[in-house]
C-alpha cells in the first residue's frame, strides 16, 4: 500500500544497552499486528537481532529497520545497539529519522549513553521523546526517575502518560483533564503542565488560555503541541 510522505513517521529507538529497545520494538510490532507474538532475546527470536552473532550474545550490534501501521500512519522503527562501542553506528541513523526516542531503563535512571543520544538528537534538531521502560521492575521509584530526567534534560520534560496507581494500565495525560489515580503526580497536574508549556509557542492560544480562562480542547492543542516539540528548549 503506497503512503504519502505526510503519512510516514520515522522513529529511531536509541539509548543505553539493556534499556529494552529491542523488546520495545517487539511489543510495538506485536501491538501493530505485524508479528503474531513477541519474540524473546533468550530464544533468539526477536525481529531486530537478526544475525547469528546477535542471537548468540543476546544484544544488538547492528541497526535494524522494522515497520508497522497505526490509524493510517506508516511508522518506520529503527532499533539501534546500545553499547558505547557502537555509539557511532547508532547515531548514524538519526539523519533518517524525524524523531529520536531515547529509551531509559527505570531501574538505572539516566545513563551516560542516554545523555549522549539526547545531545546528538538536539544537535541534529530532531524531535525528542523519552520512553521509560521496565517500570514494573522491583524497587523502581518512578518519581525519582522522573526527577532525574528533569535534572538531566530540563523541566520541559513532562509526562504524556503515567502508569495507574496499581500499575495495571497506562493513563493518558494529554487528552484527559482528569482521571485515574496515578503512580505519582496526577492526571490533572500533568495535563496542566503540558498545556502551560504548549501555549507558550502560540500567542493566540495563550490569549484564550489566560484572558478568557477557557478550557482548551485537545484539538486546539494538537498543532501547537507539534510546534512545541520542535522548539529547541534544551
Feature roles, as predicted:
Residues 1-104, 110, 153, 186, ...:
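P-loop NTPase switch module centered on the Walker A-proximal segment
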Residues 1-19, 37-38, 105-233:
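P-loop NTPase catalytic nucleotide-binding module
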Amino acid at each position: 500500500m503506497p503512503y504519502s510522505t505526510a503519512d510516514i513517521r520515522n522513529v529511531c529507538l536509541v539509548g543505553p544497552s539493556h534499556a529494552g529497545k529491542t523488546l520495545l520494538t517487539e511489543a510495538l510490532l506485536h501491538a501493530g499486528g505485524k508479528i503474531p507474538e513477541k519474540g524473546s532475546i533468550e530464544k533468539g527470536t526477536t525481529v531486530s537481532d537478526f544475525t547469528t552473532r546477535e542471537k548468540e550474545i543476546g544484544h544488538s550490534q547492528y541497526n535494524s529497520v522494522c515497520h508497522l501501521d497505526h490509524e493510517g500512519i506508516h511508522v518506520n522503527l529503527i532499533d539501534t545497539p546500545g553499547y558505547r562501542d557502537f555509539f557511532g553506528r547508532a547515531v548514524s541513523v538519526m539523519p533518517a529519522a524525524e524523531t529520536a526516542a531515547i529509551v531509559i531503563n527505570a531501574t538505572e535512571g539516566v545513563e551516560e549513553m542516554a545523555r549522549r543520544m539526547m545531545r546528538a538528537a538536539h544537535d541534529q534538531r530532531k524531535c525528542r521523546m523519552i520512553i521509560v521502560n521496565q517500570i514494573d521492575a522491583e524497587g523502581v521509584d518512578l518519581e525519582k526517575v522522573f526527577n532525574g530526567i528533569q535534572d538531566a534534560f530540563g523541566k520541559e520534560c513532562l509526562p504524556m502518560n503515567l502508569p495507574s496507581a496499581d500499575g495495571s494500565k497506562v493513563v493518558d495525560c494529554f487528552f484527559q483533564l482528569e482521571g485515574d489515580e496515578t503512580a505519582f503526580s496526577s492526571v490533572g497536574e500533568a495535563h496542566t503542565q503540558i498545556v502551560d508549556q504548549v501555549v507558550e509557542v502560540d500567542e493566540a492560544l495563550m490569549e484564550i488560555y489566560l484572558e478568557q480562562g477557557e478550557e482548551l480542547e485537545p484539538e486546539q492543542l494538537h498543532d501547537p503541541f507539534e510546534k512545541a516539540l520542535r522548539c529547541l528548549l534544551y
